[in-house]
């Protein structure tokens, strides 16, 4: 966790300033592109809001209501990316839910902003009901072009480095990233360390 900041620093300081002569131009473009994509969501920075290419919020719940990260008023926000048909998600989401319910029962003020990463609305709704996560803010970017093909509203997958699921980000009350790409077991551990230091 947090090694992406080292990667971005190395790219900005050495690679794109032509101090790495062993890297060919094709590879350099790939490295620089990746660093540019993940730089906005490094630990300690405010999590990127889900805005479309025109700067408008676009993540909608199952009823079509738009939601944003900033609307959440809690000491902590768990940002969860999951795929309803992902086998690993089917196992991990109930564990995440149990962990959060335990934290909430001890008085921790935490809310969940859960992003479905797939384009099948029926599967997404079924997953929410089956996994009993209806108390989370469940949103998705389910849009299709005129021919019925899935279309993303923004580059949020790149910004949040979502190439597999589930992925968890822990945010503070100001939506700054405390931790990212953590396991469900680390949620309580990290919050415990923070709460213990207050």
Residue ranges of predicted features:
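Extended hydrophobic-aromatic, low-complexity segments
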Residues: 79, 87-92, 122-125, 178-181
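A structural signal for short secondary-structure junctions
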Residues: 72-73, 105-108, 129-132, 160-164
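Thiol/disulfide oxidoreductase modules built on the thioredoxin-like
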Residues: 146-192
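Oxidative protein folding and maturation machinery
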Residues: 1-65
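Short loop/turn microsegments at loop-to-beta-strand junctions
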Residues: 46-48, 77, 165-166
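Short active-site neighborhood of thiol/selenol oxidoreductases, capturing the structured segment around
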Residues: 65-96, 111-113
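Structural microenvironment flanking redox-active thiols in thiol-disulfide oxidoreductases
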Residues: 90-131, 147-153
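Short acidic-hydrophobic, aromatic-tinged amphipathic segments that line or gate anion-handling sites
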Residues: 138-142, 181
């Amino acid at each position: 966790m947090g090694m992406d900041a080292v990667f971005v620093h190395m790219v900005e300081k050495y690679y794109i300033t032509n101090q790495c002569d062993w890297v060919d131009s094709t590879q350099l473009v790939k490295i620089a592109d990746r660093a540019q994509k993940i730089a906005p969501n490094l630990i300690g920075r405010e999590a990127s809001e889900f805005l479309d290419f025109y700067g408008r919020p676009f993540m909608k719940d199952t009823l079509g209501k738009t939601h944003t990260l900033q609307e959440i008023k809690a000491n902590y926000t768990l940002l969860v990316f999951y795929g309803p048909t992902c086998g690993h998600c089917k196992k991990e989401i109930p564990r995440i839910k149990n962990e959060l319910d335990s934290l909430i029962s001890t008085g921790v003020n935490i809310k969940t902003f859960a992003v479905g990463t797939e384009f099948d609305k029926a599967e997404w709704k079924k997953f929410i009901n089956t996994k009993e996560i209806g108390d989370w803010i469940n949103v998705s970017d389910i849009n299709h072009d005129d021919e019925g093909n899935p279309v993303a509203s923004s580059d949020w997958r790149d910004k949040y480095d979502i190439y597999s699921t589930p992925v968890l980000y822990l945010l503070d009350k100001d939506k700054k990233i405390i931790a990212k790409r953590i396991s469900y077991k680390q949620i309580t551990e990290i919050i415990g360390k923070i709460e213990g230091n207050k």
